[in-house]
């Protein structure tokens, strides 16, 4: 018999791989490590509400802006263009332009579906109910994607961002320790970063301080807070352009060495920006971010190049966070923090301690039972269990997976699954031995008889783990991940690894006089 065989080589390789990649996580040395989840590491947990009505309003605002710009280009005379949650409305001044207007609306419709109502020269346009529902769903997905993008740029490891309910999002941020980190993360997440260029209503702005929102609305304008000068400023309600045309944002320093955010527009945005500034020299244009006016300079000349700056007495950190928010894209809808909960690191440590005690305690009891009941066969099974644990930790570390409390429960469960596989193998071997067969044949038949049952049960469990991971959320994913890895590891260690050890020991086993020492079988071989 050959001492070394393919199965034993695989087992030794699995052992070396498991130990090698587990050391950084277990001993806190350099190398790939397992990331601890919120429940083990501590951090910030938030429940956010997405105001999808605002997404619909913003959609209609963008549509109204595009309609106004393109109608002017095509010399279609429109009056009183207004936008609200119910859609947009306007008046066509020249009935002869009706066909051109219909063609323009069809062009602006794109892949969406409009409901267009016409009463004489008055038009109203809105999305169909199906399109509105689709917009709300897509808004949730867009907000989730943007939050993940921002948190990645912020430098947080393994944030968990998932939809919860119809219009709510759960955000888990492991590792948030200080109040400053909490504040920055919260501000970065909740910032809509909705950038707009809007014209100042020069005719009525002098009365802005004494004006109500309703009075402004009747004028086709909107009252916003002026962050630069204080008070209020009256702007034309239909924006010139918005942040959808923004391509880049970065922190630069002005002539006073103060941090400001420089932004760049795409080709379409640059053209609209240039056309408007060229046609409105001497008038003011406001840079609006999240419904707050940061500056409203007088246009001195046509502004080409499609770039601008946002200043507002920012700190370097604030300017950096704003640039991240702008680069990652504007949220179609504002979000509101509905619930905030801090998980302290002490709670995480308690969870780790309790879980480790449960895991180690259960592991020792299992190994004790296996060694007492199955003798040396039980010891070999225990070796497989140890390698199984190392493999789980190693694979999670290699892929940078997050370990959660349910994940640790999954590890405990896989220990039971691995034990079950070894028990089936040992019982099949003992059955053949009791029938009077030799050790070599008993081991061979034992593995053949046990393998089918082990594969069937493990593959079924693996399919369940994959489905749980694919369709589950948060804690369920953590449980499914460790269970799935553990199942694959148990197949390698129980079927391949232990059989390799037996094959290496066959010369000794063939000569043994006591089956009890090796397999716990009390009767002796004939």
Swiss-Prot record:
GO BP, one annotated term: protein transport by the Sec complex
Membrane topology summary: Multi-pass membrane protein
Coiled-coil segments: none
Subcellular location per the Swiss-Prot or TrEMBL entry: Cell inner membrane
Residue spans crossing the bilayer: 8-28, 356-376, 379-399, 405-425, 453-473, 478-498
Claim: Magnesium is one of the keywords in the record: no
Sorted UniProt keywords: Cell inner membrane, Cell membrane, Membrane, Protein transport, Translocation, Transmembrane, Transmembrane helix, Transport
Major localization class: membrane
Annotated NCBIfam families: 2A0604s01, secD
HAMAP family: SecD_B
Protein name, as recorded: Protein translocase subunit SecD
Organism: Helicobacter pylori (strain J99 / ATCC 700824)
């Amino acid at each position: 018999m050959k001492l070394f065989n393919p199965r034993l080589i695989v087992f030794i390789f699995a052992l070396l791989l498991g130990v090698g990649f587990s050391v950084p996580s277990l001993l806190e040395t350099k190398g790939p490590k397992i990331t601890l989840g919120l429940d083990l590491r501590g951090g910030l947990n938030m429940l956010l509400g997405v105001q999808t009505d605002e997404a619909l309003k913003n959609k209609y605002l963008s549509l109204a802006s595009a309609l106004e710009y393109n109608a002017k280009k095509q010399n279609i005379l429109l009056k009183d263009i207004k936008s609200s949650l119910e859609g947009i409305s306007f008046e066509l001044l020249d009935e002869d332009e009706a066909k051109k207007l219909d063609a323009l609306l069809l062009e602006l419709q794109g892949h969406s579906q409009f409901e267009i109502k016409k009463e004489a020269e008055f038009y109203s346009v809105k999305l169909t109910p199906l399109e509105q529902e689709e917009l709300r769903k897509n808004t949730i997905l867009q907000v989730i994607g943007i939050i993940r993008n921002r948190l990645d740029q912020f430098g947080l490891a393994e944030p968990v961002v998932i939809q919860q309910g119809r219009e709510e999002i759960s955000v888990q941020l492991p590792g948030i320790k200080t109040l400053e980190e909490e504040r920055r993360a919260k501000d970065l997440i909740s910032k809509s970063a909705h950038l707009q260029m809007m014209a100042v209503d020069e005719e009525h702005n002098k009365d802005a301080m004494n004006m109500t929102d309703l009075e402004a609305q009747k004028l086709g304008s909107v009252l916003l807070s002026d962050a630069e000068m204080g008070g209020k400023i009256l702007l034309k309600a239909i924006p010139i352009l918005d942040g959808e045309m923004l391509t880049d944002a970065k922190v630069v320093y002005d002539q006073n060495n103060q941090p400001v955010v420089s932004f760049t527009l795409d080709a379409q945005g640059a053209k609209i920006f240039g056309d408007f500034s060229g046609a409105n020299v001497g008038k003011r244009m406001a840079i609006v971010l999240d419904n707050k006016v940061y500056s409203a300079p007088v246009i001195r000349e046509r502004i080409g190049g499609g770039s601008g700056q946002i200043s507002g007495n920012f700190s370097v950190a604030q300017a950096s966070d704003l640039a991240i928010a702008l680069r990652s894209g504007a949220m179609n809808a504002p979000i509101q923090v509905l619930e905030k909960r801090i998980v302290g690191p002490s709670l995480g440590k308690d969870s780790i301690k309790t879980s480790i005690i449960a895991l180690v305690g259960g592991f020792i009891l299992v190994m004790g039972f296996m060694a007492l009941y199955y003798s040396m066969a039980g010891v070999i099974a225990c070796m497989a269990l140890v390698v199984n644990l190392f493999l789980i930790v190693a694979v999670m570390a290699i892929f940078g997976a997050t370990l959660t409390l349910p994940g640790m429960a999954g590890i405990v469960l896989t220990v039971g699954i691995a034990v079950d596989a070894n028990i089936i193998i040992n019982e099949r071997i003992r059955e053949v031995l009791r029938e009077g067969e030799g050790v070599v044949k008993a081991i061979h038949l034992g593995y053949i008889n046990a393998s089918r049952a082990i594969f069937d049960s493990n593959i079924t469990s693996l399919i369940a783990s994959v489905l749980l991971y694919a369709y589950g959320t948060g804690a369920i994913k953590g449980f499914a991940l460790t269970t799935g890895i553990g199942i694959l590891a148990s197949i390698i260690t129980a079927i391949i690894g232990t059989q390799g050890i037996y094959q290496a020991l066959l010369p000794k086993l063939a000569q043994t006089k006591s089956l009890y020492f090796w397999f716990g079988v009390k009767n002796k071989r004939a």
